[in-house]
Amino acid sequence: MDLVALIPTMETSKSVKDIADFFKKLPSVGSKSAYRMAYAALSLPKSDLIAFEEVLNQAIQKVHRCLKCGLLIDDEECPICDDMTRDRKTVLVVTDSKDVYSIESTDAYHGLYFVLRGSLSPANHRTPSSIGLDALMKKVKEEGIQEVIAVTNKDLEGETTALYIANLLKNSSCKVTKPAQGLPSGAIIEYADPLTMSEAIKGRVLVGKENE
């Protein structure tokens, strides 16, 4: 019998519940998975848990968003923004820092990045200003950006975000492109294989002109 399956209907340790509640805040983690993770964590040696606490505390103190691009970094200097060999007139926009590392692994792109705080979602109270689109527009204007590549997830929220960016810049000299159709509908950027992502970026098309 799966004891974890009984958790919602039986009383459990408050400490376990508190830990599970935190795990449930992670993406794609439901109640059962959260309780499994909580019990698994508490099954580790105490020394491992203490070490994890120290690592987490260090991350809380050190990790911050780059003021220029929004990437989560440890140091004061951003390895992307401060690299003067990169194309400084092209900005690739993603909705999560982990997407930057996925794209960097393809070696298909050598420009700058801008990390939004998620995709547009009125239902989840994610507005243009709250996800950072105002800051993106400011960057485009002040730095003379010539191309914005919208690499958002291929779901409704991601596509809506890409179209919104294109609409904001439709009367400017900056073009807005997106990866070619190699990425299937519903695709999540971090799960795309490097070759597919590389080809999609190299073959990028203007937003709104995908089927022409």
Residue map of PLM features:
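N-terminal amphipathic/basic-hydrophobic helices that include classical n-h-c signal peptides
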Residues: 1-9
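Catalytic cores of large soluble enzymes that bind and process phosphate-bearing ligands
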Residues: 11, 44, 48, 124-128, ...
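Cys/His-rich Zn2+-binding cysteine-cluster or related metal-binding knuckle/ribbon modules and their
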Residues: 11-17, 25, 35-100, 206
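Extended interfacial segments that mediate partner engagement and assembly in macromolecular machines
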Residues: 34, 83-152
